[in-house]
Curated annotation (Swiss-Prot):
It comes from the Bacteria. AMP binds at residues 31, 36, 57-59, 85-88, 92, 129, 140. PANTHER family: NUCLEOTIDE KINASE. Consists of three domains, a large central CORE domain and two small peripheral domains, NMPbind and LID, which undergo movements during catalysis. The LID domain closes over the site of phosphoryl transfer upon ATP binding. Assembling and dissambling the active center during each catalytic cycle provides an effective means to prevent ATP hydrolysis. The lineage of its organism: Bacteria, Bacillati, Actinomycetota, Actinomycetes, Mycobacteriales. It catalyses: AMP + ATP = 2 ADP. PROSITE patterns: ADENYLATE_KINASE (PS00113). Catalyzes the reversible transfer of the terminal phosphate group between ATP and AMP. Plays an important role in cellular energy homeostasis and in adenine nucleotide metabolism. Its EC number is 2.7.4.3. Belongs to the adenylate kinase family. It comes from Rhodococcus erythropolis (strain PR4 / NBRC 100887). The gene is adk. This is Adenylate kinase. Residues 126-132 are annotated as: LID. Monomer. Pfam families: ADK.
Amino acid sequence: MRLVLLGPPGAGKGTQAAILSEKFGVPHISTGDLFRANIGQATALGVEAKKYIDAGELVPSSITNDMVKARVAEPDAANGFLLDGFPRSVEQAQALEGILKDLDTRLDGVLSFVVDEDIVVERMLARGRADDTEDVIRNRLRVYRDETSPLFDYYKDSIVSVDAIGEVEEVNARALAALGK
């Protein structure tokens, strides 16, 4: 099972990815974890990414693409993976398509976790993180919307929407149903 998980910050992608990862026996690959691992191990890509992160800039797609390429080629991802936070743009989606083609495989689908923005704000404020103010959260949601909206058209033939409002178990049941599992 090779899936891309889309959804705004606070939609519960990470939570659902952890459950689906265990259920399907495939790794949950998040770009945040990839960045932390590469930086922590001081890989060439990690050193390069750290320069951008330390400067408060977005890590260029070329670096992120290379990290994802290396990660999905690892043995534990041979039977599938769940990508969380990647791709974020059509450019990255095209890169992913090329990466998978080189591995002689393709995506099985794209799950889009759909949740009302006011609920996301409520959820994220409830986490109590100092940097999670309503303005910051709404800005993150705007950036997400602007960045990823073209992906919905790009993946129009393989995207399935999942209502991400409700208890974790309910959302998971909907995700499994959407996948036909």
